[in-house]
Amino acid sequence: MIVDKKIIKYNLIIFNVFSIVGLIILLGLTFTKIIGFQWVYSSLLTVVFSNISLVIGLILPNLLYTSATKLNTQQVKSARFGFFILGIITLSSRLFWYAVPIVIIGFVNQWQFQGAVFNVFPAILWPLSMIAVHVVVNYLLLNKEIKERNKLKELNNNVATGDSLHEAF
């Protein structure tokens, strides 16, 4: 498995909790007349497309990996270019899902920042926040995993050398 299930789960949960809290704050600001409903509509649209991008980026590599492990050596050699192209399509698909809300909002607003229905700033800010959540979650999980591996290596070294017995007595 390329992307650990824990990473998938934490990324989706944290981004969606962050999105819900952000939408609640935006609704509060809307009801106090600080911002318009355009921000809320744009945020909802962008959160949907950001979740699609997040799912594609986290789950599709695992699907590719499981399908690649079922191939024998000759098939892998002939399918290597296909998997390379599929990886490029996956990456460009994620970029496409970031751009879709901006294009929709731009088209509806007649290419102005704020229109009657949408505002373009949430379409830019939500994907950036998703990338930030993605980076922070992955850094924290990988850092924790590296520390656990180092502890296990140290314990294995102590057991192998007998140092742990000397320290106990």
From Swiss-Prot:
The chain crosses the membrane at residues 12-32, 44-64, 85-105, 117-137. GO terms for biological process: proton transmembrane transport. It is a multi-pass membrane protein. The keyword ATP-binding does not apply. Its main location: membrane. GO terms for cellular component: plasma membrane; proton-transporting ATP synthase complex. It is found in: Cell membrane. Keywords: Cell membrane, CF(0), Hydrogen ion transport, Ion transport, Membrane, Transmembrane, Transmembrane helix, Transport. The keyword Transmembrane helix applies. A possible function for this protein is to guide the assembly of the membrane sector of the ATPase enzyme complex. Belongs to the bacterial AtpI family. This is ATP synthase protein I. It comes from Mycoplasmoides gallisepticum (strain R(low / passage 15 / clone 2)) (Mycoplasma gallisepticum).
